[in-house]
């Protein structure tokens, strides 16, 4: 039986602790916050998108960075195993649009409670308010290679260990304690940490009219983002207007797919509000609506086309006098209005910061970590898992799957 210390009580850390304990080791889980799963509690707007039930090809293709590194981890512990784990732990789950898996209760607290029940059953020693200051090392006996032998806490206490698993998360949602401690531990161990940037993060928008639509969610729209004439992103789905710009699944995914240096630039964005219709079909629909409302003012004739919050903005951008009678609207004005519906314009003005990022892009360089075990190639008995690694995926439960899979593999492979 080895003494295993896991640093970080998030999803990867809890799964690593459970796997190591169920493999016969004595496990101490160190968490610097007052409770486990503080960031997990707020994921998925407090509902916790546990994983995604799509097939393995979709799983891999949803990983944006270093997907090949995850072959062993995903095949050793896949999404169905995650679903089975939680159901066996007393947490019923449900499958929603896009194969996103949520607890039936819609409460992330129930996910954390299920994990805590398993940690207790497996006799994992949980120590809260326990911030690690540094890792401890000794000579491994192998030429030029050291091994980790424990940790020192911020209060000076030393905890001896045969294996240490670093599962400290990234820099996103720093109010939950994600302050990048693991990057420092990795650098002190001799590891390379790639550039750290926010990902799955909203965009700022230049136009003031976004504020008029704050809180408005648009479903079944198509978003296209341009750099000059080049299309950088073109996807169908759901988005949200905020007081500063745009957010929601489509926008968060765009932030992960557009190169960070380019995302800093002003970029043109168009929203197709009626993607199921061609411009010609939409014109016929608008003509029909106008015919039915021919004696009404323009401002009172378009309620069937848009949510109420959007109508004043659409009127303003159309250039049509809101008090104009519908039967006085010219063909040119109507066609301009149709084009506006098919290409609602915004100017993106860079990404929001880490405090609003769901995940971190960048981390411990994966070429320095064994993908079959999650053990450091530089320091014996030191393991990394979860967001501290240079791994990230699009929104939809895929980032938590990375955490579960890499955490489980690290816990299973401690010696």
Region spans (language model):
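Short hydrophobic core segments
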Residues: 5-7, 132, 158-174, 187, ...
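A glycine-rich dinucleotide-binding beta-alpha-beta segment and adjacent secondary-structure elements
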Residues: 127-129, 134, 312-392
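A conserved short coil-to-beta-strand element within the FAD-binding core of flavoproteins
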Residues: 128-147
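Glycine-rich loop(s) and the adjacent beta-strand/alpha-helix scaffold that form part
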Residues: 163-209
